Design a protein with these regions (language model features):
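ABC ATPase "signature
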Residues: 141-142, 150
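Conserved ABC ATPase signature
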Residues: 55-60, 64
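Conserved ABC ATPase "signature" region
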Residues: 32-51
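Conserved catalytic motifs of ABC-family nucleotide-binding domains
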Residues: 77
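Catalytic Walker B motif of ABC-type/P-loop ATPase nucleotide-binding domains
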Residues: 81-84
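Short helical segment in ABC ATPase nucleotide-binding domains corresponding to the A-loop/adjacent helical element
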Residues: 17-25, 35, 39
Length: 172
């Protein structure tokens, strides 16, 4: 399983390339394949490997650091990616860009993603299934459209009340 945390947690003394290749190296993947994977992943998020592979995290913007954290999480091709509020500390422009990136990664790499968020707009945008919990108990699991149109109870209805203005096409 790959994971991306709210705090990016790149190793400051390691280059971008070293950060991304860390897990594949720990799994004893072929060195040539690791290099190819790092380059391919950087290109997939519009970061030129020649420009970024040897940079240190201190030389990156917050959004770039988060992209590298995501790439590190998927570099060893996990079947499941856990993302725990990864964009909560980012500015709106970076957040939107990274949300779009997550959708692209999900589609391109076919990785099941468990995305933890308190941002209902984010849940509606990114999820094909949403699990609403209260006090550690599951209240409803459904598609975004089903959650909006048929909330299980008042808690779910109120939780998503502001989202009712969103057109179904935006989150389907």
């Amino acid at each position: 399983m790959g994971y991306v945390l709210q705090q990016i947690a790149l190793f400051p003394n390691m280059t971008v390339g070293e950060n991304i290749s860390l897990i594949p190296e720990m799994k004893k993947m072929d060195k040539k394949k690791i290099k190819e994977t790092v380059d391919r992943l950087l290109k997939s998020v519009d970061l030129d490997p020649k420009d970024y592979k040897n940079r240190l995290p201190e030389d990156l913007s917050g959004g770039e650091k988060q992209r590298i954290g995501i790439l590190r999480a998927i570099a060893a091709s996990p079947k499941v990616l856990l993302m725990d509020e990864p964009f909560s500390a980012l500015d709106p422009i970076s957040k939107t860009s990274l949300q779009d990136l997550i959708k692209k990664i999900h589609d391109d790499f076919k990785i099941t993603t468990v995305f933890v968020t308190h941002d209902m707009d984010e849940a509606l945008k990114l999820a094909d299934r949403i699990c609403v919990m209260k006090d550690g108990k599951v209240i409803q699991i459904a598609s975004p459209t089903e959650i909006i149109n048929n909330p299980e109870n008042n808690f779910v209805s109120e939780f998503f009340d502001n989202e009712k203005r969103i057109n179904d096409e935006q989150f389907s």
